[in-house]
A protein has these predicted regions:
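Fungal secretory targeting signals
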Residues: 1-20
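Hydrophobic ligand-binding cavity/cleft-lining segments
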Residues: 19-84
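Short, highly charged C-terminal tails/helix-capping segments
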Residues: 23-24, 192-200
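Hydrophobic/aromatic beta-strand elements that line small-molecule binding cavities or substrate pockets
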Residues: 39-41, 118-125, 137, 145-153
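A short, structured loop/turn motif at beta-sheet edges
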Residues: 44-48, 124-131, 150-160, 199
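Hydrophobic pocket/interface hotspot
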Residues: 49-54, 60, 94, 123, ...
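Glycine-rich portal/gate segments that line the openings of hydrophobic small-molecule binding cavities
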Residues: 72-141, 173, 197-200
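Beta-strand/loop substructures that line and gate deep hydrophobic ligand-binding cavities in soluble
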Residues: 134-189, 194-196
Length: 200
């Protein structure tokens, strides 16, 4: 009996370490696309704290070198909402930097106008119980994409942040050739910015 309890204790103690070192993911399975941009980073924080920062769109400029401005509007009537948190079905409008600005950033860090782009998205999944958030790009049929972000408690006071955006469509190959490397850099910079902000 003592031996089995000891082994159970050792297994539970080592499980978070194994998760952190493995290719564990909290991201859902996604269909392959023409290309994708991804990020994965361990952060000394809690899932609730990271979720609060990730879903506080009004405060993105305080830490995010990629998404410098985010605005949510209602699905009906396209009305700016007083609560700038994600709700499934609502719209998101972003002003982004591709490539991302150098870290660190804050709300007063100016954009590089040559790298500024705008995008419109629809929020598709808000899953706080799973630590997952997703939206679809509302572009032309020539380029479509879905972006997922996920948070996981991996033990020892650490959170795993993951993000993936999968691009499809006729012009997705052109996007990959022109901005693929910069998009990847931007995803990695956002992950680093989240880490810096949560660990300061």
């Amino acid at each position: 009996m003592f031996k089995s309890k000891f082994l159970s204790f050792v297994s539970l103690t080592l499980l978070p370490v194994a998760l952190a070192q493995s290719e564990y993911t909290n991201l859902p399975a996604t269909a392959p696309g023409v290309f994708n941009a991804t990020a994965r980073i361990e952060i000394k924080s809690t899932v609730p704290a990271a979720w609060d920062v990730l879903t506080d769109f009004a405060n993105y400029a305080a830490w995010n070198p990629f998404v410098r401005y985010a605005l949510t509007t209602s699905a009906k009537g396209n009305i700016t909402l007083p609560d700038q948190r994600p709700v499934e079905g609502n719209f998101l409008f972003f002003r982004v930097q591709i490539p991302a600005l150098p870290l660190p950033v804050n709300k007063d860090t100016p954009d590089n106008l040559l790298n500024t782009q705008l995008s419109a998205e629809r929020i598709t999944h808000v899953q706080p119980e799973l630590g997952r958030l997703a939206w679809d790009y509302l572009g032309e049929l020539a380029i479509t994409s879905t972006r997922w972000q996920a948070l996981s408690d991996i033990g020892n006071g650490m959170v795993l942040y993951e993000s993936i955006e999968v691009f499809h469509g006729l012009f997705a190959g052109v996007l990959k050739d022109t901005l693929g490397e910069s998009l990847q850099q931007s995803f990695e910079a956002q992950a680093e910015g989240l880490k810096l902000y949560l660990e300061c």
